[in-house]
């Protein structure tokens, strides 16, 4: 359910940028969402459609969502691998001395103004 909070944060941020840059309308917002962030893209889209109606600059804006693939780094052998496929255990050396490099974040990648 944190998708609603995420959408409100994105809308607040974009609306502030629209004011600061004297924009009249926003055409689209592109979000990058990590594969293991816990954010469910179709919930983001649903909340976006609801929340944008209450804004000044985003009423007609499209939300574009791109996935950031989850990648884990193994400190034992120095290799990276796809997190979703192998989880915490390195498929090359079977070490659990690993950490997530990408895939847990979300980023406002692009804002397109009209």
Where are these regions (language model features)?
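Short functional micro-motifs and their immediate structural scaffolds
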Residues: 82, 95-99
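Short metal-binding segments enriched for Cys and/or His
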Residues: 100-110
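Cys/His-enriched microdomains
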Residues: 72, 88, 106
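Short, flexible, mixed-charge glycine/proline-rich loop motifs
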Residues: 62-70, 79-84
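Flexible glycine-/small-residue-rich
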Residues: 33, 67, 110
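Acidic pyrophosphate-coordinating catalytic loop
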Residues: 37-38, 70-74
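Long, charged N-terminal interaction/targeting segments
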Residues: 1-64
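Short cysteine-rich clusters marking metal-coordination/redox-active sites
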Residues: 74-77, 90-93
